[in-house]
Amino acid sequence: MANTLEQLKSYTTIVADTGDIEAIKRYQPEDATTNPSLILKAAQIPEYSALIDNAIAWAKLQSTDIEQQIDDASDKLAVNIGVEILKLVPGRISTEVDARLSFDKEKSIAKAHKLVRLYQEAGVDKSRILIKLASTWEGICAAKELEQEGINCNLTLLFSFSQARACAEAGVYLISPFVGRILDWYKKDTGKDYDAVNDPGVVSVTEIYNYYKQHGYNTVVMGASFRNIGEIIELAGCDRLTIGPSLLEELANSQLAIQPKLVPTSTTVAVAEPLTEAQFRWEFNQDAMAVDKLAEGIRNFAIDQGKLEVMLKAKLAN
């Protein structure tokens, strides 16, 4: 019998949530996703030192201003890592816009344009890139404009139905609803443990998936942020699942037989009027978990971006 990972691949597109080339070679995902935390982690890998050196040298040629050099080196490094990953996956790479721009639509769009340009200069067509943006109102509005330009987006840090609905209404290519971080919040808030079927993160993604299919939205649902393989197995059949190396390994070593749990419905429900900004903000604000986890996620990505920039600044000074 095929291992659990191979079975899962027959129902769901598997994406590697890592910047680690060796892990990607091992598990042969369709796509890969990165974020500031994963780029920081990848930057510690000795095999990537040449990519960092290239980013530093390139940044020095762009500007004499140290702050601009740091910004350029950071973007170039993310793209360099993405280019290497694209040599190994047949699909797409997700590269994230600086989390500190999460509440600035125009600067998010400008950063997306810069990342796409850097990929194109490295010989990568925009059809192989997803621009990752936080699922704030501003991030969703930025994605709407980028999608209209033909730049596909991955809306991340998504914890609530209101965020998912707004993304679909904006015509976003793909969303990354988080599973494990939702579970973390509820375990801390209630003091309870949850089995996979009743896991609040699994329930959330299932609701979003069913809503999208019932309403005929084309936005891809890619479950993200997993704590255990039970969550993953309960979401078999989801459009895509992005999974970290440790859980990919666990799935590859498992012989558990699985069946699809998420199945697209054939009934189409009439689409409601799109959420206004005021409606979105009110509905989102009513979800204490989503408010907490979005804010925390943005802060933590910004912290790791800052750590990466400290490392790059030291190298730029040499």
From Swiss-Prot:
EC number(s) from the headed UniProt entry: 2.2.1.2
Top-level lineage group: Bacteria
Enzyme kind, highest EC tier: transferase
Keywords: Cytoplasm, Pentose shunt, Schiff base, Transferase
Location of the active site: K132
One cellular component (GO) term of this entry: cytosol
CDD domains: Transaldolase_TalAB
Family per similarity comment: Belongs to the transaldolase family. Type 1 subfamily.
Role noted for this protein: Transaldolase is important for the balance of metabolites in the pentose-phosphate pathway.
PANTHER family for the chain: TRANSALDOLASE (PTHR10683:SF18)
Cited HAMAP family: Transaldolase_1
NCBIfam families xrefs: PRK12346.1 (NF009001), talAB (TIGR00874)
Name of the protein in question: Transaldolase
Organism: Shewanella oneidensis (strain ATCC 700550 / JCM 31522 / CIP 106686 / LMG 19005 / NCIMB 14063 / MR-1)
Organism placement in taxonomy: Bacteria, Pseudomonadati, Pseudomonadota, Gammaproteobacteria, Alteromonadales
Gene symbol of the encoding locus: tal
